[in-house]
Amino acid sequence: METFSLLEIFKAVILGIVQGITEWLPVSSTGHMILVDEFIKLNFSNTFISTFLVVIQFGSILAVLVIFFRKLNPFDSAKNIKQKKETVRLWLKVIIAVIPSGVIGILFEDDIDRLFFNSTVVAIALIVYGIIMIGLEKRNKRPKYKDFSQVTYKLALCIGLFQCLALIPGTSRSGSTIIGAVLLGTSRYVAAEFSFFLAIPTMLGASALKLLKAGFGFTGFEWLILGVGSVVAFVVSIVVIKFFMDYIKKHDFKVFGYYRIVLGIVVLAYFFLL
């Protein structure tokens, strides 16, 4: 599509909002995108739509970098040598953690999409991980790791293995890493932080890979749509991340577990009963 359309821009805004909200909450952005896509379909080729849904994640990633810039910046002049070394170790932990899902994603992305990218799998994953999330909170176990600096390289790798589960649509990237981190003994806050940091290389890699596969031969209007979606995702992500980090200081994840179960039932009902 090459003509300018306010309707398509409006759709890009809505999709950017959905992306910005659901990427950072453990509720599955894919599950929401499937539902939204039923009602708000971009009037472009399937190839471009697929690229759009991945590339707008750039906006979400930028939000993480802005919010946690000081913590993630090893060159911050306000940090002493010890703090700078700790920041370097933080990045090493993130790199170690992202290797498993990165390797599996590169090798089997097309196979996983072909086998699992459907409403049934998404709905089941929403419900199953919702139940796990509720059960996890009912354990009421005291966290062993209450600060990110306490996370070891071995623990980082183990959390990274949990992120591999997110390759199955409906699982939720943030949900799988948060569940894994809490199961392994981190506090909710550390689990959420690590999930956000892991998103940087994970989503950057996925977006870059998608762009390389699709090529860069988009029309001017298609580039505009990509830009609008990314900017909206960035702004919404800023708000959602700040809200979520404040929320988990005083609350647990059960509400997200119940929400996932309800959404999973809605997806099943919509696609099989309506």
UniProtKB/Swiss-Prot annotation:
For the keyword Repeat, the answer is: no
Q: Which residues cross the membrane?
A: 7-27, 48-68, 88-108, 115-135, 151-171, 189-209, 221-241, 253-273
Annotated membrane topology: Multi-pass membrane protein
Coiled-coil blocks: none
Location(s) in or outside the cell = Cell membrane
What is one cellular component GO term in this UniProt entry? plasma membrane
Q: Which Pfam families match?
A: BacA (PF02673)
InterPro entries according to UniProt: UppP (IPR003824)
Which UniProt keywords are present, listed alphabetically?
Antibiotic resistance, Cell membrane, Cell shape, Cell wall biogenesis/degradation, Hydrolase, Membrane, Peptidoglycan synthesis, Transmembrane, Transmembrane helix
- The EC number of this protein is 3.6.1.27
Kindly list the GO molecular function terms attached to this UniProt entry.
undecaprenyl-diphosphatase activity
GO-annotated biological processes: cell wall organization; peptidoglycan biosynthetic process; regulation of cell shape; response to antibiotic
Which leading EC class covers this enzyme? hydrolase
Q: Which reaction is this enzyme known to catalyze?
A: di-trans,octa-cis-undecaprenyl diphosphate + H2O = di-trans,octa-cis-undecaprenyl phosphate + phosphate + H(+)
- Give the family this protein belongs to, as stated in its UniProt record: Belongs to the UppP family.
Q: What does this protein do?
A: Catalyzes the dephosphorylation of undecaprenyl diphosphate (UPP). Confers resistance to bacitracin.
In its miscellaneous comment, the UniProt entry states: Bacitracin is thought to be involved in the inhibition of peptidoglycan synthesis by sequestering undecaprenyl diphosphate, thereby reducing the pool of lipid carrier available.
Q: What is this protein called?
A: Undecaprenyl-diphosphatase 1
Organism per entry = Clostridioides difficile (strain 630)
